[in-house]
């Protein structure tokens, strides 16, 4: 019997403030992963500056492409495809990765695969262990908070979404109020473990009969509480503030997700995105799902695969490769790209 050929994909990720390249074999094995972070450059601004992000991508993308190939000990001739995030994200940042991937595809003749950034985060799970379908994914990051149902690796639908702010965005905004440098999530998580939920911040939409989220009211309640305390000269405990904020976020995410698991009965539950690195959220999701009568397999990617990285793009691209979904050199950035919603799903 003929031995199955390994499929190696060189992937690019540049949708926001991380420039990353990776070589992924068979959609599940990371042969190399290089991430050039820009956190220090953006921290003084309190958030990502698109023009600064694009300039940094330009400066490092050639070098980290070379590093990814060297780390994987492969040449261009060993590759089977080139993959790149083409949305959603910052348009200028996306274009740097897209143009690099197009140039590589044109120079080598290798097929080009465009990858949805959100599907990349979800596909990070298959770098940990095989995903059994149907699967349910909670994607929670600075730009998105969504619950997605996956019927197979390339067919999916959104069953719940945020109506306003994403959870990660709320973390960063209240971090500014607390004087925490961008990105604020890790510090707030650490503080939350040292405090108590004493402020009773709102859990918006937690009892509504849907899987949507809203975090703008929570953010406003937090800011108003802090401003009122400042006006009357009251000093609030930062650990209790962090614990109260995080409890409100985690309560809603856990309640909605567990309810969706009960309805859709997935074989696997996946959590992805930068906020998936939050230890309080990981602990709560593991506890809630383990208590279910019919619990799915739970895959929580390691912390290094929760943030933006090219390995997850390579994993998602492998699924597209097997399905024959290739792009041509007209591939363009789609900064507002969205996964299909349930009512639009075919």
Swiss-Prot record:
Organism: Lactobacillus delbrueckii subsp. bulgaricus (strain ATCC 11842 / DSM 20081 / BCRC 10696 / JCM 1002 / NBRC 13953 / NCIMB 11778 / NCTC 12712 / WDCM 00102 / Lb 14)
Positions bound to Fe cation: 117, 121, 308
One example GO MF annotation: N(6)-L-threonylcarbamoyladenine synthase activity
Residues given in the record as substrate binding sites: 139-143, 172, 185, 189, 278
CDD domains: ASKHA_NBD_TsaD_bac
EC number from the UniProt entry: 2.3.1.234
The UniProt record lists the keyword Acyltransferase: yes
Keyword Transferase: yes
SUPFAM superfamilies assigned: Actin-like ATPase domain
Name of the protein this chain belongs to: tRNA N6-adenosine threonylcarbamoyltransferase
Family named by the database record: Belongs to the KAE1 / TsaD family.
Annotated Pfam families: TsaD (PF00814)
């Amino acid at each position: 019997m003929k031995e199955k050929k390994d499929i190696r994909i060189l992937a690019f990720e540049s949708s926001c403030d991380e420039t990353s390249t990776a070589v992924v074999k068979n959609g599940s094995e990371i042969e190399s992963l290089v991430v050039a972070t820009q956190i220090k450059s953006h921290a003084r601004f309190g958030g990502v500056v698109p023009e600064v992000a694009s300039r940094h991508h330009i400066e490092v993308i050639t070098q980290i492409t070379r590093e990814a190939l060297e780390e994987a000990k492969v040449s261009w001739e060993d590759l089977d495809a080139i993959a790149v995030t083409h949305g959603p994200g910052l348009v200028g940042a996306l274009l740097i990765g897209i143009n690099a991937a197009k140039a590589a595809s044109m120079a080598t003749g290798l097929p080009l695969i465009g990858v949805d950034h959100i599907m990349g985060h979800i596909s990070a799970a298959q770098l940990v262990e095989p995903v059994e379908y149907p699967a349910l994914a909670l994607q929670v990051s600075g730009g998105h908070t969504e619950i997605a149902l996956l019927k197979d690796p390339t067919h999916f639908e959104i069953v719940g979404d945020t109506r306003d702010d994403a959870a990660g965005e709320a973390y960063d905004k209240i971090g500014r109020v607390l004087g925490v440098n961008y990105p604020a999530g890790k510090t707030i998580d650490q503080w939350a473990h040292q405090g108590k939920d004493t402020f009773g911040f709102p859990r918006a939409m937690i009892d509504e009969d849907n899987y949507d989220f809203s975090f703008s009211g929570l953010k406003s309640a937090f800011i108003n509480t802090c401003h009122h305390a400042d006006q009357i000269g009251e000093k609030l405990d930062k650990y209790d503030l962090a614990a109260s904020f995080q409890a409100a976020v985690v309560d809603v995410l856990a309640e909605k997700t567990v309810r969706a698991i009960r309805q859709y009965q997935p074989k696997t539950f996946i959590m992805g995105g930068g906020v998936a690195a939050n230890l309080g959220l990981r602990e709560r999701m593991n506890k809630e799902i383990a208590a279910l009568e019919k619990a799915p397999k739970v895959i929580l990617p390691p912390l290094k695969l929760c943030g933006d990285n090219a390995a997850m793009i390579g994993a998602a691209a492998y699924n597209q490769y097997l399905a024959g979904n290739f792009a041509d050199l007209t591939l363009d950035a789609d900064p507002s790209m969205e996964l299909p919603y349930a009512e639009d799903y075919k």
